[in-house]
From Swiss-Prot:
This protein's GO CC annotations: mitochondrial small ribosomal subunit; plastid
Family label: Belongs to the universal ribosomal protein uS19 family.
Pfam families associated with the record: Ribosomal_S19
Keyword RNA-binding: yes
Gene name for this UniProt entry: rps19
Function comment: Protein S19 forms a complex with S13 that binds strongly to the 16S ribosomal RNA.
Highest classification ranks of the organism: Eukaryota, Viridiplantae, Streptophyta, Embryophyta, Tracheophyta
SUPFAM superfamilies associated with the record: Ribosomal protein S19 (SSF54570)
GO molecular function, one term: rRNA binding
Entry keyword set: Plastid, Ribonucleoprotein, Ribosomal protein, RNA-binding, rRNA-binding
HAMAP family, alphabetized: Ribosomal_uS19
Protein name: Small ribosomal subunit protein uS19c
Organism this protein belongs to: Epifagus virginiana (Beechdrops)
GO terms under biological process: ribosomal small subunit assembly; translation
InterPro entries found in the cross-reference section: Ribosomal_uS19, Ribosomal_uS19_bac-type, Ribosomal_uS19_CS, Ribosomal_uS19_SF
């Protein structure tokens, strides 16, 4: 289901990613697709596939659903892991 605002824009999908998904759809197979393309837009042919998206350190697998259509792949993978402030750091206090 594509929402109307996304139809007005030209959607960017990396060519290698689109080719891999088309090949898997033709074979009717489900495999994990590894990609570094966080800027690619999710399109309806991706629904039901597992795409492993790079977060800068590792690839995190994401299952694509119909609610994700129109969003970018990078929106669903966090790049920063906040570990909290240091508890016993008295040097920064006065």
């Amino acid at each position: 289901m594509i929402h109307s605002p996304t139809l007005k824009k030209n959607l960017f999908v990396a060519n290698h990613l689109r080719a891999k998904i088309n090949k898997l759809n033709n074979k009717k197979k489900k495999e994990i697709i590894v990609t570094w393309s966080r800027a690619s837009t999710i399109i309806p042919i991706m629904i039901g596939h597992m795409i492993s998206i790079h977060n800068g350190k590792e690839h995190l697998p994401i299952y694509i659903t119909d609610h994700m259509v129109g969003h970018k792949l990078g929106e669903f993978v966090p790049t920063l892991n906040f570990r909290g402030h240091a508890k016993s750091d008295n040097r920064s206090r006065r």
